[in-house]
């Protein structure tokens, strides 16, 4: 924009770098009296930057100079002469501070606004469970719900149940696992984060197989299976699937109903779990349980984690150990974890073979789901048919 305060100011561009203020004044002085000649120079070298500003006392003289001198040659270079606008360097100096302050205020506003905005999203899961919004003000939002998970009255009863079975089973794997399972239980305390739970299983399989006790899996499965126990109290849908299929055999319902029953009953979760947690971590558990007995071969498979089929073949290879010894150990430890004293009583009645069968079929189901329906004898097909039919299960 034309400088209103200096209407007689002209911009002269395209100057020869040798042109100085004196030559400019001599050239433009013939149009009128010049009040100022400003040749822009480089600060460091003090050389001309090739443009200048000349201010005439009379705007009319300035217009005449523009009319006559624009495009003319000065010191061998064609120059541009025009009415001066707010110079870029001035507006640049003035502008950036404004924009910077604007940006800063925006940034502060964003930080101030975004801060509060972001925490609710992080605290959202906690709010799902009815936790107080004060979590939003604290940095450690996720851990706090976990710590406060057990208190919610809904689950106040079930966690002890969980603790009872998981305690004995986990005693072999160490106290750290006990710590983790309570955290998991805490997550059970509210409904939102269980949606976040499936990711931990995917990490857990490796932890589990590494630790040998795969207690994180216990944490997860105790979450899952004990919630099946809770499901008996307030989640009829698992029962509908499992009891319809298997009859009311408590311990056996317990293990299949929630963890493996999820695979059988809930189609979507079945595939998901069979591919990931069950494919990797339920199988890894078998390996880690079989490992104490003689699953050194079974230890190898965890890396092949994703492909249920290959893993299943390896299970067939080490099935005497992983499914035999490990299966008993697994069914013993694992089903004790999941079904607690009830399972132990049932196992005493039924004897180990059925606990074996109890521990074993679910993975078979998951493997057969992965597309490898390798006939494993009557036990495998029988167990699957029992799962499907329900009559076979109710026999026990």
Curated annotation (Swiss-Prot):
O-glycosylated. Arg-185 is dimethylated, probably to asymmetric dimethylarginine. The modification N-acetylmethionine is found at residue 1. InterPro entries: Nucleotide-bd_a/b_plait_sf, RBD_domain_sf, RBM, RBM1CTR, RRM_dom, RRM_dom_euk. It comes from the Eukaryota. Gene3D superfamilies: 3.30.70.330. The modification Phosphoserine is found at residues 91, 335, 355. Residues 148-162 have a biased composition (Pro residues). GO terms for molecular function: chromatin binding; mRNA binding; RNA binding; RNA polymerase II cis-regulatory region sequence-specific DNA binding. Its main location: nucleus. Keywords: Acetylation, Activator, Glycoprotein, Isopeptide bond, Methylation, mRNA processing, mRNA splicing, Nucleus, Phosphoprotein, Repressor, Ribonucleoprotein, RNA-binding, Spliceosome, Transcription, Tumor suppressor, Ubl conjugation. Residues 323-332 have a biased composition (Gly residues). The modification N6-acetyllysine is found at residue 30. Residues 8-86 form the RRM domain. The modification N-acetylvaline is found at residue 2. There is a cross-link at residues 22, 80, 86 (Glycyl lysine isopeptide (Lys-Gly) (interchain with G-Cter in SUMO2)). It holds the Pfam family RBM1CTR. It is found in: Nucleus. Residues 336-396 are annotated as: Necessary for RNA-binding. Residues 186-236 are annotated as: Necessary for the association to nascent RNAPII transcripts and nuclear localization. Coiled coil: none annotated. Residues 185-205, 241-275, 334-350 have a biased composition (Basic and acidic residues). GO terms for cellular component: catalytic step 2 spliceosome; euchromatin; extracellular exosome; nucleus; spliceosomal complex; supraspliceosomal complex. Homomultimer. Found in the supraspliceosome complex. Identified in the spliceosome C complex. Forms a complex with ILF2, ILF3, YLPM1, KHDRBS1, NCOA5 and PPP1CA. Interacts with CLK2, KHDRBS2, KHDRBS3, SAFB/SAFB1, TRA2B and YTHDC1. Interacts with ERAP1; the interaction is RNA-independent. The RRM domain is necessary for RNA-binding, but not for splice site selection, indicating that its splicing activity does not require direct binding to RNA. This is RNA-binding motif protein, X chromosome.
């Amino acid at each position: 924009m034309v400088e209103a305060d200096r209407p007689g100011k002209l911009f002269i561009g395209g100057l020869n770098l040798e042109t100085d203020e004196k030559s400019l004044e001599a050239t433009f002085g013939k149009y009128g009296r010049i009040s100022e000649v400003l040749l822009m120079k480089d600060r460091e070298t003090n050389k001309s930057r090739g443009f200048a500003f000349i201010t005439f006392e009379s705007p009319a003289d300035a217009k005449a100079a523009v009319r006559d001198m624009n495009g003319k040659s000065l010191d061998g270079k064609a120059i541009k002469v025009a009415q001066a606008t707010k110079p870029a360097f001035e507006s640049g100096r003035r502008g950036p501070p404004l924009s910077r302050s604007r940006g800063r205020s925006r940034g502060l506003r964003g930080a101030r606004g975004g801060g509060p905005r972001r925490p609710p999203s992080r605290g959202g899961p906690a709010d799902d469970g009815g936790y107080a919004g004060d979590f939003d003000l604290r940095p450690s939002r996720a851990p706090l719900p976990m710590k406060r998970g057990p208190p919610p009255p809904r689950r106040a009863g079930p966690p002890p149940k969980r603790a009872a079975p998981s305690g004995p089973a986990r005693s072999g794997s160490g106290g750290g696992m006990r710590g983790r399972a309570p955290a998991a239980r805490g997550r059970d305390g509210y409904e939102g984060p269980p949606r976040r739970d499936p990711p931990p299983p995917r990490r857990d399989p490796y932890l589990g197989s590494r630790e040998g006790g795969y207690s994180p899996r216990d944490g997860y499965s105790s979450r899952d299976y004990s919630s099946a126990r809770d499901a008996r109290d307030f989640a009829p849908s698992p029962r509908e699937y499992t009891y319809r299929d298997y009859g009311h055999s408590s311990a056996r319902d317990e293990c299949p109903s929630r963890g493996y029953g999820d695979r059988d009953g809930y189609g979507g979760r079945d595939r998901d779990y069979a591919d990931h947690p069950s494919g990797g971590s339920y199988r890894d558990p078998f390996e880690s349980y079989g490992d104490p007995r003689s699953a050194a071969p079974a230890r190898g498979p965890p890396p092949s984690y994703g492909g249920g089929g290959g893993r299943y073949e390896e299970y067939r290879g080490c099935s005497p150990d992983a499914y035999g010894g490990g299966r008993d150990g697994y069914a013993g430890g694992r089903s004790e974890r999941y079904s607690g004293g009830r399972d132990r009583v049932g196992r005493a009645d039924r004897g180990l073979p059925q606990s074996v069968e109890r521990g074993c079929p679910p993975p078979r189901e998951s493997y057969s789901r992965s597309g490898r329906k390798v006939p494993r004898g009557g036990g495998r097909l029988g167990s699957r048919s029992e799962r499907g039919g329900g009559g076979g299960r109710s026999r026990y």
